Structure formats: structure tokens, C-alpha cells
């Protein structure tokens, strides 16, 4: 099925049973699952559950991405074999996905015999098709570790701007890209040795072949996301531009992965066998369940195939992967859905602030996984926009929507129905206008989910919940219960409320599967599907005793979560001479706990402020930062906008009032010191994610000048100042 057929297929969903294969990107097997990862898995899981509730044959497939140099080196560092490491990490990842209700039909590993066979089969088919080329290339080689070095395992001086400590493929200061062999004064990140240049035969997938370009131009027209289509067209260029480059699909020994057939000492690059791992995991499931694997993945298959990914790996999934499949005799993806990144409280996740939150720490702290599923769903739509986890909003929204609006409906009605009416609903109440309105809304809500417009689905659902609560408030069952003469009205009110609650639970089931399961047990009904909107509660089936379905989010739980993920300042404070220093409780806590000092009180030795305790100092997280970009702020005569590398996954944006002292180009490439745990501040010009430190005289008029702090060479981004 082509991507352009998606709309007609979706329109036919209620009539025909579809065969649908769905994947999420494979987590790399050298680290923990964190909440940034969970955005994708929760997004995919909601979509999969939506389709299952239509009765379609849906398989949700995943695996750990296990091959490559980083896994090999980490295993060596931990004194393990690579296989021992990936087995341990697999168990951790599976535990985390299970905790958050991610309903994989199979979660496997790319280090499997199925993946080896499929990778070899695809490679040999591409070779037979004239799409594999052999070339001698020159690479950096570590003479100490006796291994060729991937681009990211070499650092040195940028050949363009001469910035130090730049990676082997691109400069973070000037943005230039280059070959690793062009790097000046290079060194191995693995051993510190100076790499030597060595030639080696490598194997390339000929993506530049006109056949690939022609195919991709046609295939891209069916992508559902305009942003993805535009990006693909940018990569492809105009017809005749020949912008596509061949792709190096091989790596030299030592390497943890699959050896290329007929090429001893050469291994498939991880990005070749990783997407093939989708099929390998599915084949493992098919072999165990008796499913016809070939019928799903062969060219021309009527089955649908969807990949959910982060926007940072769009290139691999919309260029290499579909071309590999097309020219190896397989079906191509029906569509690829990319999502944006996650920020926390308006800033990128940070270990120092405790917002680099792991899945396991969330569970260990006692937070309900369905709270996060709901919050992410409320923020997600069909675009590639980034989403923000605002922790205050998280608490408020979960408490208001799920507890205050949704769960509250059942708790207000169930007791009366059990006590007064033997737990049996009034059958005539199932035709109440409010119930009819909710029932009619279910198909639209389901359509929003299938279109990946989860925010719309939940807004619609909560609007209906508001109407149900307004109905209960108007009927006042607690007042009706005081007079036996109101028994019929009380029975109707409770019955309408509980049928409305059943329909709301149906609407929320893709997002809150465990709550839905508890609701099904409460009503004594079979697992809810979309068709069950037309199957109301019946007096023939009494409800069970009501069990509380969800608690409120407590601010203390969030504080504990941040503390669990924050780099401890205890050791640093003690090393500085303070005994019994307390661990900081986050930027907000630090701000709240800080004791004000008098600006008028002169301190000893002419210092500007009164003394502070070592505990107070321990709350401030000072870090080395590299200024990778700098520009003047339009509309401000004081501010410069700095882009800082603080040793985290992403750079930080900081506005600093030092424009009078520096030209932007003077600062690029310099190291400085920043306050890393200062709460992000929304400014007229954007969000500032910290503060850089600068010195000035007490009397700036008599002695003007601003001087940013510069550490000695040898300091690196992310190092703590202590």
C-alpha cells in the first residue's frame, strides 16, 4: 500500500479489518529509558490501542538497538562482554516499557539470528541489483586500541575556524562539516592517542543511483506530515541536482555487529541492521504465532506499515530505509510519523536540575504512569512540534481533569446505586439526551486518536466530562437521596452518570488502559472497544463495589522525583569544608530556601554581600560552558544571546547583558562559567536557561568594564566549578 492510500483506508476502517504493522524507534542498548524516550513510545502505544479497539489486526513491534562501537566500548569499561551488557539493558528497558503500559506484541533485540539473516538477505539483494559499491577510503585509526575510529570518537581542531575540541565530522562553533581526516591536531576519545591515517575497503549503498532518486521523489509525496515532506524535498533537491550521496554501510573490526557476507573483518554499520531489526522482531513473533511473515513484508503486500520516530532520525527512515526496502524486494513504509523533542519546564532536560528523569525513577518515586501518559497525550498532535512537560501544569491538569472531572463522576454516583438499587442501572436512563450526546461523540474522538491528534481527542473528552459534572451538580443526587419519594429521579441520575462515565472511560481507554481495565471490572463488562459505545449498561448486570481509581498528584512527589534525578551536591559541599550539607531540592527549592541578606550591610574585606553558609553555596550549580554561538539581540542595546554547550544533550540559550563589553564574534569558542540550576526565565526575546558570570567594579561609573569569567585551558563543558 502506498502512503497516498492512507486517507481512503482510514475512512474505511470501521468496514474492513486492516493488517497493520507498527514500530517505534529502537532504544540504544547502552543507557536508561528516560521521559524523553517515553514521549514516542506512549504516542505509538496510544495509536496502536486505538486501532486494536477498531478490531484491526495490529502488531506493535520493538527491539533494543544493540550494535556499534559505543556498546562495545561501554561493555569493555564495565568488564562485561557486549552480549552480557545488552542482555542486562534489555531487561531494564523491558521493565520500563511494561511499567508505562507500552503494549509491544514483541520486544526483541537486533543481536538476533533473525536479524543477521534478514540483514544479509537485504544486502545481497541490493548487491545483485547493482546498488552496492566497494571503495578504498582513508580513516583515522587508533594505534593504541588498534581500531578505526568513528567520527564521534575523534576530536581536534576545526580546519575552518580552528576551534578546539571539535568532533570528527562537524564543528559546533562555526557549523562547518568536514571529513575526519581534515581535523587538525586530532586525538582519540577512546585512548587519547594521536590517530594515524589508514586506508580500508568499505562498502556503500548507492543512494545516488538515479533509480533511488526517482523512487524517493515519488514515495515522499505520500508522507502525512508536511514538515517531513518539505525536509525530504530539501534533501533530494530539484530534479537533476543529484544531491543524494552514497551511504557507507560498513565498519572495520573490532566491531560489535554482523560480519558482511564475503567480506572478512568488515561489519554492517549499525544503521543498516537496526531498521532491519523491525522485521527481525516481527519475524520472531510470526514464527512463534504461526503468522505468515512474508505476506506482510513482501512487495505489493496489502498490509500497512508505520514507523513512529523522533524528528532527529527522519533522514534514515525516509531516505535509506525505504530505498533499501524498495530495491531488495520488500514493501515500503505506508508512512513515517515524526515527533518533536521534550523539554521540562521550558528548558532541555538537565541532570543538575533533576529534570533528566529516568523511567525507573518515576516509578520508584511512586508516581502513576498513567498520569504521564495523559499529560503527554494532552500535548501531542500530528506535527513535529516540541512539547513541554511543565511540572506545575502536570500536577494541575492531572488533578483537575482526571481526578476532579473524570473519576469524580463514578465516585459521586456508585454508592447511591449500590445502596439504594442493588447496583442495577435504570434501563430507560440509557436513552437520556446526555448519554446520547456522549455516544455520538465517540466516533469523532476515535478519529482524532487515529489522526494522532491526541490533544483534540482529550479536549473533546474533557468538555463532555464538564457537561456530565454539570448534570450531576444540577440533579443533586445527594439531595435526592434524602427523600424516598425521589427514588426514581435518583435512580435515573445515578444511571445516567455511570453510563456517561462508561463512555468517558471508553474515550480515554487508549490513554489510560489500566484505569479502563479497572472500570471494566467495576461494571463487570468485557474489554471496551469502539463499537461498545452502542452497548449501554444493563440492569441485568449489577455494578461492583466502587474502588478508588486514581489519586491526586502531590507536589511532594514531584519534589522527590527531581531530587532522585538530581546530581547530588553533598560530596562537593563536604569537600569544600562544610559538614552535613543538605542535598539541593531543585531550582525552585533553592530560590525559596535562600535567606535574604541586607544589601546595606557591609561585609568583611570589602565584599558586596553578607556571608553565606556552605549549605547556601551548595545550592548553586556552577558549570563550565562553551560559547558555541553568539549574536546581538534585536531591539536590545544591552543583551547578547549566547548558545552554550554545558555537556548536556542539547545546548542552552542564555541572554546576557554584556553587549557593551563584547562583540559577538569575540566570544564564540570561549569557555566561561554559568549558573546551571537557575530557573529558566521567560524574557521578551525568548527563554533564558541560566546565567553566565561576569565581573565588574563596585562603582561601574568610576571604573567601567565587564569581564566574563574564563577558566584555564583543560576545563571542559559540563565540568562543575567547586
From Swiss-Prot:
Binding site for Zn(2+): 158, 161, 171, 174
Chain positions recorded as ATP binding sites: 351
Pfam families xrefs: Anticodon_3, tRNA-synt_1g, tRNA_bind
Annotated catalysed reactions: tRNA(Met) + L-methionine + ATP = L-methionyl-tRNA(Met) + AMP + diphosphate
Keywords: Aminoacyl-tRNA synthetase, ATP-binding, Cytoplasm, Ligase, Metal-binding, Nucleotide-binding, Protein biosynthesis, RNA-binding, tRNA-binding, Zinc
GO function terms (MF aspect): ATP binding; metal ion binding; methionine-tRNA ligase activity; tRNA binding
GO cellular component: cytosol
Protein's cellular compartments: Cytoplasm
Enzyme class: ligase
Classification via InterPro entries: aa-tRNA-synth_I_CS (IPR001412), Anticodon_Met (IPR041872), Met-tRNA-synth_bsu_C (IPR004495), Met-tRNA_ligase_1 (IPR023458), Met-tRNA_synth (IPR014758), Methionyl/Leucyl_tRNA_Synth (IPR015413), MetRS_core (IPR033911), MetRS_Zn (IPR029038)
Cofactor binding summary note: Binds 1 zinc ion per subunit.
Domain tRNA-binding: 616-722
Record note on quaternary structure: Homodimer.
PANTHER family referenced in this protein's UniProt entry, alphabetically: METHIONINE--TRNA LIGASE, METHIONINE--TRNA LIGASE, CYTOPLASMIC
Function statement: Is required not only for elongation of protein synthesis but also for the initiation of all mRNA translation through initiator tRNA(fMet) aminoacylation.
HAMAP family named in the record: Met_tRNA_synth_type1 (MF_00098)
Protein name (Swiss-Prot/TrEMBL): Methionine--tRNA ligase
Phylogenetic lineage: Bacteria, Pseudomonadati, Pseudomonadota, Betaproteobacteria, Burkholderiales
Gene: metG
Amino acid at each position: 500500500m502506498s502512503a497516498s492510500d492512507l486517507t481512503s483506508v482510514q475512512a474505511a476502517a470501521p468496514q474492513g479489518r486492516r493488517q497493520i504493522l507498527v514500530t517505534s524507534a529502537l532504544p540504544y542498548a547502552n543507557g536508561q529509558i528516560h521521559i524523553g524516550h517515553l514521549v514516542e513510545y506512549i504516542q505509538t502505544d496510544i495509536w496502536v490501542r486505538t486501532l486494536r479497539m477498531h478490531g484491526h489486526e495490529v502488531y506493535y513491534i520493538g527491539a533494543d538497538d544493540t550494535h556499534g562501537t559505543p556498546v562495545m566500548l561501554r561493555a569493555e569499561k564495565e568488564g562485561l562482554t557486549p552480549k552480557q551488557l545488552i542482555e542486562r539493558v534489555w531487561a531494564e528497558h523491558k521493565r520500563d516499557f511494561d511499567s508505562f503500559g507500552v503494549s509491544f506484541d514483541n520486544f526483541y533485540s537486533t543481536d538476533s539470528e533473525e536479524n543477521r539473516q534478514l540483514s544479509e538477505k537485504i544486502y545481497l539483494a541490493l548487491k545483485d541489483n547493482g546498488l552496492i559499491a566497494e571503495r578504498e577510503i582513508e580513516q583515522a585509526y587508533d594505534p593504541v586500541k588498534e581500531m578505526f575510529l568513528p567520527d564521534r570518537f575523534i576530536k581536534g581542531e576545526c580546519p575552518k575556524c580552528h576551534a578546539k575540541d571539535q568532533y570528527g565530522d562537524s564543528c559546533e562553533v562555526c557549523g562547518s562539516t568536514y571529513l575526519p581526516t581534515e581535523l587538525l591536531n586530532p586525538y582519540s576519545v577512546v585512548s587519547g592517542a594521536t590517530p594515524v591515517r589508514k586506508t580500508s575497503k568499505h562498502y556503500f549503498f548507492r543512494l545516488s543511483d538515479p533509480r533511488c532518486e526517482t523512487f524517493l521523489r515519488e514515495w515522499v509525496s505520500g508522507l502525512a506530515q508536511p514538515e517531513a515532506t518539505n525536509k525530504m524535498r530539501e534533501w533530494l533537491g530539484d530534479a537533476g541536482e543529484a544531491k543524494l550521496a552514497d551511504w557507507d554501510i560498513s565498519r572495520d573490526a573490532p566491531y560489535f555487529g554482523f560480519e558482511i557476507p564475503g567480506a572478512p573483518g568488515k561489519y554492517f554499520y549499525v544503521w543498516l541492521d537496526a531498521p532491519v531489526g523491525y522485521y527481525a522482531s516481527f519475524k520472531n513473533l510470526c514464527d512463534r504465532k504461526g503468522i505468515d511473515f512474508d505476506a506482510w513484508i513482501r512487495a505489493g503486500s496489502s498490509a500497512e506499515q508505520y514507523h513512529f520516530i523522533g524528528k532527529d532520525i527522519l533522514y534514515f527512515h525516509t531516505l535509506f530505509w525505504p530505498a533499501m526496502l524498495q530495491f531488495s524486494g520488500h514493501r515500503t513504509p505506508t508512512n513515517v510519523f515524526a515527533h518533536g523533542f521534550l523539554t521540562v519546564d521550558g528548558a532541555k532536560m538537565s541532570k543538575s536540575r533533576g529534570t533528566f528523569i529516568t523511567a525507573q525513577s518515576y516509578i520508584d518515586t511512586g508516581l502513576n504512569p498513567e498520569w504521564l501518559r495523559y499529560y503527554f497525550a494532552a500535548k501531542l498532535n500530528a506535527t513535529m512540534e516540541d512539547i513541554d512537560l511543565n511540572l506545575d501544569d502536570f500536577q494541575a491538569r492531572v488533578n483537575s481533569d482526571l481526578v476532579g472531572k473524570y473519576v469524580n463522576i463514578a465516585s459521586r454516583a456508585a454508592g447511591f446505586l449500590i445502596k439504594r438499587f442493588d447496583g442495577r442501572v435504570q434501563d430507560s436512563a440509557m436513552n437520556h439526551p446526555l448519554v446520547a450526546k456522549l455516544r455520538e461523540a465517540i466516533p469523532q474522538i476515535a478519529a482524532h486518536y487515529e489522526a494522532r491528534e491526541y490533544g483534540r481527542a482529550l479536549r473533546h473528552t474533557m468538555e463532555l466530562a464538564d457537561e456530565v459534572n454539570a448534570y450531576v451538580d444540577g440533579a443533586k443526587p445527594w439531595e435526592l437521596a434524602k427523600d424516598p419519594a425521589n427514588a426514581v429521579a435518583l435512580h435515573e441520575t445515578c444511571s445516567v452518570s455511570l453510563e456517561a462515565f462508561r463512555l468517558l472511560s471508553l474515550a480515554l481507554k487508549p490513554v489510560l488502559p489500566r484505569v479502563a481495565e479497572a472500570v471494566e471490572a467495576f461494571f463487570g463488562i468485557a474489554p471496551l472497544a469502539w463499537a461498545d459505545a452502542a452497548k449501554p449498561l444493563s440492569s441485568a448486570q449489577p455494578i461492583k463495589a466502587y474502588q478508588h481509581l486514581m489519586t491526586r498528584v502531590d507536589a511532594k512527589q514531584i519534589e522527590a522525583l527531581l531530587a532522585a534525578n538530581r546530581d547530588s551536591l553533598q560530596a562537593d559541599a563536604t569537600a569544600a569544608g562544610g559538614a552535613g550539607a543538605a542535598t539541593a531540592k531543585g531550582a525552585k527549592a533553592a530560590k525559596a530556601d535562600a535567606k535574604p541578606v541586607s544589601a546595606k550591610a557591609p561585609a568583611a574585606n570589602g565584599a558586596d554581600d553578607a556571608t553565606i553558609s556552605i549549605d547556601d553555596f551548595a545550592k548553586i550549580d556552577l558549570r563550565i560552558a562553551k560559547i558555541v554561538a553568539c549574536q546581538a539581540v534585536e531591539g536590545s542595546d544591552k543583551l547578547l544571546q549566547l548558545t552554550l554547550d554545558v555537556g548536556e544533550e542539547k545546548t542552552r540559550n542564555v541572554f546576557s547583558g554584556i553587549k557593551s563589553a563584547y562583540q559577538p564574534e569575540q566570544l564564540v569558542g570561549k569557555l566561561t562559567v554559568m549558573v546551571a540550576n537557575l530557573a529558566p526565565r521567560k524574557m521578551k526575546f525568548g527563554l533564558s536557561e541560566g546565567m553566565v558570570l561576569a565581573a565588574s567594579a563596585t562603582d561601574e561609573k568610576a571604573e567601567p568594564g565587564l569581564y566574563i569569567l574564563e577558566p584555564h585551558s583543560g576545563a571542559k563543558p559540563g565540568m562543575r566549578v567547586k
